């Protein structure tokens, strides 16, 4: 498998896409004072507690500092805890996070169905490439 390099921050993606988090908890640091304002990781979300924290952080306009693509902060092996969850389990939990954080349910539904359609299209293309 290839490597995934996460970089940059595009906080506007939060409004129209579930895949807005361009960070991994390995390379993510917050001051204690910010945790006191936005809260800690919500362990109610089994595979996406970091996603929930990022969502709350961005919604409250805490963007922090961003490194360049050349600066390696952490190296994460594949096969971690969240990789045991399916695409749809992740998607359902991300949907619950949005609703829990009071995002408009109509917009959340649109983003949800858009993610499903994109996944189906990607799967279709993958099958078509094999033929």
Regions found by a protein language model. Give the residues of each.
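Short, solvent-exposed polar/charged micro-motifs at secondary-structure junctions
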Residues: 1-3, 77, 116-122
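Conserved nucleotide-sugar donor-binding catalytic segment
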Residues: 3-90
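Membrane-proximal basic amphipathic "stem/tether" segments
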Residues: 92-95, 99-131
């Amino acid at each position: 498998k290839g490597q995934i390099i996460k970089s940059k921050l595009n906080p506007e993606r939060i409004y129209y896409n579930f895949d807005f988090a361009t960070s991994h908890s390995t390379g993510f640091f917050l001051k204690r004072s910010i945790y006191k304002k936005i809260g800690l990781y919500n362990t109610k979300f089994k595979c996406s507690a970091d996603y929930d924290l990022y969502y709350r952080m961005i919604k409250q306009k805490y963007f922090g500092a961003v490194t360049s693509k050349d600066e390696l902060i952490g190296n994460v092996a594949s096969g971690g805890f969240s990789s045991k969850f399916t695409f749809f389990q992740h998607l359902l939990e991300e949907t619950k996070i949005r609703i829990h954080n009071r995002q408009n349910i109509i917009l959340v539904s649109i983003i949800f169905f858009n993610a499903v359609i994109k996944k189906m299209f990607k799967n279709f293309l993958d099958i078509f490439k094999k033929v």
